[in-house]
Amino acid sequence: DGPGVIRHIWITVDNKTSDGDCFVLRDLVLRMYWDDEENPSVETPLGDFFCCGFGQECIVNSSVIAVVPSRGLNSYFAMPFHKHARIVIENQHKNPIPAFFYQIDYCLYASLPANTSYFHAQWRRQALTEIGKDYVILDGIKGTGQYIGTYLGLSTLQRYWWGAVSYTHLTLPTKL
């Protein structure tokens, strides 16, 4: 119970439940609720929140997200709340997860400024985009705040490299 600010979240989890299984990080869903919200301000697969897309673990080194080789998932985003914070992990995986450990570091305060912004994160995927139609990255957020950034994972639906394009029809400038 708050007011307070979550300063650091550390999670480690087995990323496989068998040799042929590699989607634990995609199948664990992270939801965060601030104060009396009915709908989560954060709703994303656990791995994608920590910039490890497609259920694959990877190394990340940034000022707000760090994923270390020993599967330590770290978030340093400031996540303020006025009354209370609720963090939920839902297992949508086909098997039980044998190990899940976490630590949440936070500070409690007498009060927070009335204009304190809440932290939001959304996840979405789309198999095909449409030419001329904007791809929505963040939707339905009300109030003022700061846009911190986007983690974008890209994959191909084709068997071969998706970047192969013929440039023979293009005319290039002769001078720069």
Task: List each language-model region with its residue ranges.
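Short, surface-exposed beta-strand/loop "edge" segments at domain boundaries and coil↔beta transitions
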Residues: E38-S41, T129, R159-W161, T171
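Active-site scaffold segments
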Residues: R86
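Residues that act as N-cap/strand-start positions at coil-to-secondary-structure junctions
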Residues: R26, I59, R71-L73, G163
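Conserved small/polar residues in nucleotide/adenosyl-binding loops
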Residues: T168-T174
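Beta-sandwich interaction modules
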Residues: N61-K83
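Asparagine-centered strand-capping/turn motif at beta-strand->loop junctions
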Residues: I89-N91
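Solvent-exposed, flexible loop/coil segments flanking beta-strands in beta-rich domains
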Residues: D1-V24, N95-V165
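An N-terminus-focused feature that recognizes amino-terminal "leader" regions
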Residues: D1-I65
